[in-house]
């Protein structure tokens, strides 16, 4: 935080989150997983484990809780995802049929992320590349945070990527989330 006022805002949000928890049960029943299927050679194999990690979380939550997890997954329009990464952390297994194009859209975007957060989700997970100002794909940056109107429906945000929490910057992406007064 760069000032006492900013610190006060964040501390007040934390206190209110604890003191006045969300009472709408739907909030705790919904979540959002965002990820990127990175693949540039168009052979259908993921180059990284981003979407697979998100899908592992999706599977665990879906199989062990009653939370409804919405997916906002993205890949290039010229990519036809067919297999997970064949590398250090995966053996190139085929994607489940429900994640294959055209059944699954693979077109997650900032509008979808904004709408899901504004409607109230308990958590947001993003797994992909990141930078000081936001997430790579689906692309979502600090300017999109200004469009959030979720008020007291504050999700836990798992920004599992590089640089989004680089607090040495003027105002990094994570800091923008924390500082937003009405969401």
Model regions and ranges:
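Cysteine-dependent hydrolase recognition
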Residues: 1-183
């Amino acid at each position: 935080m760069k000032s006492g006022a900013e610190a006060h805002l964040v501390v007040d949000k934390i206190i209110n989150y604890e003191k006045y928890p969300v009472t709408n049960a739907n909030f705790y029943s919904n979540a959002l997983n965002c990820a990127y299927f990175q693949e540039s050679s168009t052979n259908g194999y993921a180059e990284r484990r981003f979407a697979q990690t998100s899908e592992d979380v999706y599977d665990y939550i879906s199989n062990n809780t009653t939370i409804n997890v919405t997916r906002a997954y993205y890949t290039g329009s010229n990519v036809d995802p067919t297999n997970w990464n064949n590398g250090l952390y995966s053996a190139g297994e085929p994607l489940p049929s429900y994640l294959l194009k055209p059944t699954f859209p693979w077109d997650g975007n900032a509008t979808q992320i904004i709408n899901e957060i504004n409607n109230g989700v308990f958590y947001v997970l993003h797994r992909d590349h990141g930078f000081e100002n936001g997430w790579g794909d689906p692309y979502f940056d600090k300017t999109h945070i200004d469009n959030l109107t979720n008020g007291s429906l504050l999700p836990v945000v798992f920004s599992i990527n590089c640089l989004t929490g680089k607090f040495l910057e003027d105002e990094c992406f994570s800091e923008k989330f924390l500082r937003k007064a009405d969401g």
